[in-house]
A protein has these predicted regions:
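Short beta-strand element of the alpha/beta-hydrolase
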Residues: 22-34
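Primarily recognizes the serine-hydrolase "nucleophile elbow" in alpha/beta-hydrolase
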Residues: 80-144
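N-terminal cap/lid segment of alpha/beta-hydrolase-fold proteins
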Residues: 1-23
Length: 205
């Protein structure tokens, strides 16, 4: 985008040589948190590989960081990553009806904001004819929020007060939406507490 080469790190449940072509997998398009600065998209490959072992195709997004492109470039690049995975669904055995987007820290914000945009909102669509909708969608208009939202927040988060997630949860719940929030006791802004077997089981369900 804008002359900047971008990459996806793709982790599959099996090696490319042993993929069962008859088995389709859900896909998580994952945005690595970086305070919207330059990312290290290899930072969580080990942790994300554990989700792949549970049957997910993982696509870790590299976006144009805020030092070279203003917001909402990061969300737009995430949308194009979603489209890329849809176009290449057959190649990676992705179930088109089970594409999700998520992320940690600023990546979680970017992932959610990617679903607030629409194709006519400054969108730079590299793949015309392919939408960037996912299984979990958050719309800016609360009456059109249709899909489930899952949030994790540490009770000792020193960056974002956990009350923020609680407030979002309460607002969406009052609108009759399907939303869950898990407050992880003693967890700060990220860390191993977010990647336990228990939290992974919640995600894959």
């Amino acid at each position: 985008m804008d002359g900047v080469p971008l990459h996806l790190q793709i982790i599959t449940p099996q090696t490319r040589n042993t993929i069962d072509s008859d088995t389709l997998h859900p896909c998580l398009v994952y945005v690595q948190g970086s305070a919207w600065l330059e990312q290290n998209i290899n930072a969580k490959l080990g942790i994300l590989s554990r989700l792949a072992e549970k049957g997910y195709v993982i696509a870790v997004v590299e976006y144009r960081h805020s030092g070279i492109a203003p917001f909402p470039a990061q969300a737009l690049d995430t949308r194009n990553a979603i489209r890329f995975m849809k176009i290449h669904a057959a190649e990676y055995n992705v179930d088109m009806d089970k594409v999700f987007v998520g992320g940690d820290s600023s990546g979680g914000h970017t992932a959610m904001f990617s679903q607030l945009l629409h194709d006519d909102d400054q969108d730079t669509n590299l793949y015309p004819g392919t939408n960037a909708d996912v299984k979990g969608i958050l719309s800016i208009h609360e009456d059109t929020i249709l899909s489930p939202i899952l949030m994790f927040h540490g009770t000792k988060d020193r960056t974002i007060n956990p009350r923020v997630s609680v407030t979002v949860y309460q607002k969406l719940k009052s609108c009759g939406k399907d939303v869950r929030v898990y407050l992880l006791e003693g967890a700060d802004h990220g860390g191993s507490e977010f990647w336990t077997e228990e939290t992974q089981e919640i995600v894959v369900k």
